[in-house]
């Protein structure tokens, strides 16, 4: 009897459990059907959709129209950069109906500076320079503004400013309205530096010491030393004038860093950059030049007015530091060939002879060998190593070899020293100190000796090659987002954080040159590597102004730069400096995190720039994004 009761209870329990499962399943199915029915009621208009989401249709439409306007400016080149036909613009703004009163996100619009500042160079200001000692030209060196002298305004282009001629036409012509100075054409009329032809300047290629033109002058040099076999790639032209020497070296695949001081009215470096020729404001003064040791294959001075014989040959010692083993120094002008020119130079024969003797002595003290003196040219060559020089310095100790603790590549606000920078150790007299370089153009992609020697921490041959591949991919992507890149729109280009120079290497096939800047605050100091690849560049602290005139670059690349400086100085000041050196309708490519790029964009919106944020070239899942910005065309008022 007990067994029958137990079986009955078990059957009853199973029946209740099954009933419960069926009820729950039924409720689930009913909920699914109801949910599906409600979801399928799609809104038939955008107004209905905005109403359901609680959004304001008017504000959303306005935002969309504004975005479309920003990405399609009137200029043809500008519209190519910011058109949305290729990569999709990313929008990181919130789109909620609730308006948040956040005052620090309000766009601050920057007003134009006074027209008297149209050619302002912040760290080479003439008025500020007068406060400093004239000894060793200190008053013409870099002296940047103090905190209360900083400008928070936009440097205005001159009235009627025109987009410069494209290369190679720009080598020979520039618009008068862009650099309205006729003084140089009058002062140097006999020397054929520059001529005024209507509304244009013309550069015939003449110079003080090359009356037949820079091309013929370079041909004269090529008869004395090899210029066309790729062994000489990088040059430095001290006291460059309008850089005709550098302009005509380019056709021989030699790139020159031309420099001259800020002029009172002649604007020589400004003319050089307007021509599309590499140049920078600089002077041989009391400090090292802002380049690493062993940077240049050739150094040149054509009546550059540098007192090479003074201060025990201190300036020649600096040339020796930046000259590569086996590099050449070329001197023309006083005192070379003084027997022919002494009357025209209005100096006595004795004075000129003494100056040349002093230069010869200084060159010998550096262990240089005189290659030749022919006509107006004199050429010396630096030894390929210091095997013999070390023996000589045991006897002739002036100037001495610099201390091993001295950092030969360090050159930012570093005072000159009267000592010879020692070359890396060599095992034999025929070995190139620091490693031999490939001839150009193989040099651009060969692993640089500094990397082979392990002098750059955590950088090896494999990482170097990987970086080159990365930049090939990036330039391919840039061609999509900046179609004008393939059309030769950009001549003067700056890479504000150049690293290994991969950007410049990937740009070799375009009619452009790149100023490779290595920030002094960068984790790895790689400027020496860049020069070993056959490119040029300089050191720079981006909390300060760059040594160039306004409106001198067509394209600026800033990859990861602001993450370096965001805690060091005001990001706004760096962006205003970029605006100063960027030409109207010039383009900037930023690479950084979304947070940094949105911060940058909020500032540039008040600088008359138009911009959009794009995905990384490898897709949306990479945290690094790209901000592509174009400076609008505008000019200052006519006086």
Curated annotation (Swiss-Prot):
GO terms for molecular function: methyltransferase activity. GO terms for biological process: methylation. InterPro entries: Put_SAM_MeTrfase, SAM-dependent_MTases_sf. GO terms for cellular component: endoplasmic reticulum membrane; nucleus. It is found in: Endoplasmic reticulum membrane. Belongs to the methyltransferase superfamily. This is Probable methyltransferase PMT18. It is a single-pass type II membrane protein. Keywords: Endoplasmic reticulum, Glycoprotein, Membrane, Methyltransferase, Signal-anchor, Transferase, Transmembrane, Transmembrane helix. Its main location: endoplasmic reticulum. Its EC number is 2.1.1.-.
């Amino acid at each position: 009897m007990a067994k029958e009761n137990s079986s009955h209870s078990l059957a009853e329990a199973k029946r209740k459990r099954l009933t419960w499962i069926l009820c729950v399943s039924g409720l689930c199915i009913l909920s699914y059907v109801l949910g599906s029915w409600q979801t399928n009621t799609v809104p038939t208009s955008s107004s209905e959709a905005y109403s359901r989401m609680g959004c304001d249709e008017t504000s959303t439409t306005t935002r969309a129209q504004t975005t479309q306007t920003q990405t399609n400016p009137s200029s043809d080149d500008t519209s190519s950069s910011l058109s949305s036909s290729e990569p999709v613009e990313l929008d990181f703004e919130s789109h909620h109906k609730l308006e948040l009163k956040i005052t620090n996100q309000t766009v601050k619009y920057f007003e134009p500076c006074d027209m008297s500042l149209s050619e302002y160079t912040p760290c080479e200001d003439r008025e500020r320079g007068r406060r400093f000692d004239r000894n060793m030209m200190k008053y013409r060196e870099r002296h940047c503004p103090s905190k209360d002298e900083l400008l928070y305004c936009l440097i205005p282009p001159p009235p009627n400013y025109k987009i410069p001629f494209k290369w190679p036409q720009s080598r020979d012509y520039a618009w008068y309205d862009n650099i309205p100075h006729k003084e140089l054409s009058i002062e140097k009329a006999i020397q054929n530096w520059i001529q005024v032809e209507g509304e244009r300047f013309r550069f015939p290629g003449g110079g003080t010491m090359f009356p037949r033109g820079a091309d013929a002058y370079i041909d004269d040099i090529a008869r004395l030393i090899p210029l066309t076999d790729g062994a000489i790639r990088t040059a430095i032209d001290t006291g460059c004038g309008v850089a005709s020497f550098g302009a005509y070296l380019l056709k021989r695949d030699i790139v020159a860093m031309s420099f001259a001081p800020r002029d009172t009215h002649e604007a020589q470096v400004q003319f050089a950059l307007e021509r599309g020729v590499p140049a920078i404001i600089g002077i041989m003064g009391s400090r090292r030049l802002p380049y690493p040791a062993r940077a240049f294959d050739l150094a040149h001075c054509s009546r550059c007015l540098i007192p090479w014989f003074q201060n025990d040959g201190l300036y020649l010692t600096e040339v020796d530091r930046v000259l590569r083993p086996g590099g050449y120094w070329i001197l023309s002008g006083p005192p070379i060939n003084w027997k022919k020119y002494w009357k025209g130079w209005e100096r006595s024969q004795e004075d000129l002879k003494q100056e040349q003797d002093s230069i010869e002595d200084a060159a010998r003290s550096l262990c240089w060998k005189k290659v030749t003196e022919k006509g107006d040219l004199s050429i010396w060559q630096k030894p390929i190593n210091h095997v013999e020089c070390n023996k000589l310095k045991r006897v002739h100790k002036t100037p001495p070899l610099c201390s091993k603790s001295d950092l030969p590549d360090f050159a930012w606000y570093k005072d000159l020293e009267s000592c010879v920078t020692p070359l890396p150790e060599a095992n034999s007299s025929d070995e190139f100190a620091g490693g031999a370089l490939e001839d150009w153009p193989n040099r651009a992609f060969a692993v640089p000796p500094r990397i082979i020697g392990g002098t750059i921490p955590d950088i090896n041959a494999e990482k170097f090659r990987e970086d080159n591949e990365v930049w090939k991919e990036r330039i391919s992507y840039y061609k999509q987002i900046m179609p004008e890149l393939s059309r030769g729109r950009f001549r003067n280009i700056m890479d504000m954080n150049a690293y290994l120079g991969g950007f410049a290497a990937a740009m070799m096939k375009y009619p452009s040159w790149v100023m490779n800047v290595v920030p002094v605050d960068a984790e790895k100091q790689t400027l020496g590597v860049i020069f070993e690849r056959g490119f040029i560049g300089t050191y720079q602290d981006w909390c300060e102004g760059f040594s160039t005139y306004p409106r001198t670059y067509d394209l600026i690349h800033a990859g990861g730069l602001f993450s370096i400086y965001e805690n060091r100085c005001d990001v706004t000041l760096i962006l205003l400096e970029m605006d100063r050196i960027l030409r109207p309708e010039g383009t900037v490519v930023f690479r950084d995190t979304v947070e940094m790029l949105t911060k940058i964009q909020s500032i540039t919106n008040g600088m008359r720039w138009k911009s959009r944020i794009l995905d990384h070239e490898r897709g949306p899942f990479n945290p690094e994004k790209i901000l592509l910005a174009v400076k609008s065309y505008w000019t200052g008022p006519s006086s």
